[in-house]
Amino acid sequence: GTLGFGLMPLLQEYEVVVIVNTSSDDGKIVGDIDVLSGDELIANQGIKKTANEVEITEMLQICSMANHCAQTSMVSIVPEDIISVHVGVTPALREKWTEYIDVIVDELAKCGINSTRKEFVMGLDEILDQFANPSIEHGKGF
C-alpha cells in the first residue's frame, strides 16, 4: 500500500516522484502495464477502487493546490487479485515482470533519473521473501 497522508511531504519535498503500483482497472487484463502522469491521475483517469488508489489520487489533488507538487507519474500493473493481502507474484505477473521493470526504468530515465544495474541482482523470490520477513540485520530486509 501507499503512505496515505505520509505521501504528501514526499510530493512537496521532491522535484520528481515515480510511484510503482498495482491497478484495479476492470477494463484491463492481468499483466497490462500503464504509465499515468500526476495530471492524468488528478483528472480521474486513475482508478479509485482500492484505498491505495484513492490515497494516491487524493494526495496528488491536495498537493496540486500547494505551492509545490512534484512532477509525478505512476507505473502500474494489473494483478489477478488486488483485494487479497499477501506477498507474492502470480505466474501471469511473473511472465510480465521483466517488461514491468523495463517500463519502470524507462519512466525513471524520462524523468531524468539514471539507474545502473547492480553487479549482483537478487532474484524476485528472494526479494519477496525479505519483504515478507523483514530483518534488522544489516543489508537484509527493509
Per-region residue spans from a language model:
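Fold-independent oxyanion-binding glycine-rich loops
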Residues: 1-2, 20-22, 38, 77-78
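Catalytic-core regions of hydrolytic enzymes
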Residues: 1-16
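Short, glycine/charged-enriched secondary-structure capping and boundary segments
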Residues: 12-14, 31-35, 88-91
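Short N-terminal helix-initiation segments at or just after the protein's N-terminus
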Residues: 14-24
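Helix-loop-strand module that forms the ligand-binding subsite of alpha/beta enzymes
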Residues: 22-72
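Phosphate-binding/catalytic loops
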Residues: 58-139
